[in-house]
């Protein structure tokens, strides 16, 4: 059991450390980061219940609808809502870059529990290869989401646009990831590898941009 917990936590902690050590935030308190991480973790069960019910009823028979609505919209929409309520509205963003730290926290909290459940179901050896790409992808969704929520807090003239981008872009990225995974069959790696490269280039770009903003 200890090995399962450590294996589930390791990818998330590595990615979180990467973002944390880049110093894109300033004075974000770690207990707030931990709270948002836990909130992300608690989202897993209700989301999985909804996804299971919708899948059983075949609500979204087309792979694209399932990828973008049942996975992208549901997961990223709820994560965005948690960030909006617990970070944005409660005044926890002390500078624009702090949004990235909170965005990564909620995403990796979700990914950690998701990984743990997968490992319990399929075993450690079968699960480890599966956890690397999804955890990385979740981190990127969180970076993009947090970047735009942070911008919305400090750029009042374009607040609505940034909040909207903070929701829509992660939904599209997540939906694209799941659509590739479910629809490309034997050719999935040919599509997934360049897609992941694009994701990480996008994440690095947002991290660099966020590090230049101060208030």
UniProtKB/Swiss-Prot annotation:
Intervals, Cytoplasmic compartment: 24-30, 122-129, 204-215
Organism from which the protein derives: Shouchella clausii (strain KSM-K16) (Alkalihalobacillus clausii)
InterPro entries: Peptidase_PrsW_arch/bac, PrsW
Bilayer topology annotation: Multi-pass membrane protein
Catalytic activity, EC: 3.4.-.-
PANTHER family named among the record's database cross-references: PROTEASE PRSW (PTHR36844:SF1)
GO molecular function: peptidase activity
Transmembrane feature ranges: 1-23, 31-53, 100-121, 130-151, 180-203
Enzyme class at the top of the EC tree: hydrolase
Membrane listed as a keyword: yes
Compartment annotation: Cell membrane
Keyword Cell membrane carried by entry: yes
Its biological purpose: Involved in the degradation of specific anti-sigma factors. Responsible for Site-1 cleavage of the RsiW anti-sigma factor. This results, after two other proteolytic steps catalyzed by the RasP and ClpXP proteases, in the release of SigW and the transcription activation of the genes under the control of the sigma-W factor.
Keywords: Cell membrane, Hydrolase, Membrane, Protease, Transmembrane, Transmembrane helix
Protein name: Protease PrsW
GO cellular component, one term: plasma membrane
Membrane topology (Extracellular): 54-99, 152-179
Family per record: Belongs to the protease PrsW family.
GO biological process terms on file: proteolysis
């Amino acid at each position: 059991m200890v090995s399962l917990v450590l294996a589930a936590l390791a990818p998330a902690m590595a990615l979180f450390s990467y973002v944390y050590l880049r110093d894109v935030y300033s004075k974000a308190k770690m207990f707030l980061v931990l709270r948002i991480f836990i909130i992300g973790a608690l989202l897993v069960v209700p989301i999985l219940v909804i996804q299971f019910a919708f899948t059983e009823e075949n609500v979204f028979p087309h792979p694209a609808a399932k990828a973008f609505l049942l996975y992208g919209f549901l997961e990223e929409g709820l994560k965005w809502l948690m960030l909006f309520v617990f970070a944005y509205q409660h005044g926890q963003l002390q500078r624009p870059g702090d949004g990235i730290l909170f965005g990564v926290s909620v995403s990796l909290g979700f990914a950690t529990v998701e990984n743990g459940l997968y490992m319990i179901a399929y075993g450690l050896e079968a699960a480890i290869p599966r956890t690397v790409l999804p955890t990385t992808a979740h981190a990127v969704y969180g970076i993009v989401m947090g970047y735009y929520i942070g911008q919305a807090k400090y750029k009042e003239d374009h607040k609505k646009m940034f909040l909207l981008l903070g929701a829509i872009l992660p939904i599209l990225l997540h939906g694209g990831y799941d659509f590739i995974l479910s629809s490309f069959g034997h050719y999935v790696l040919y599509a997934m590898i360049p897609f992941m490269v694009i994701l990480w280039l996008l994440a690095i770009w947002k991290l660099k941009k966020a590090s230049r903003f101060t208030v």
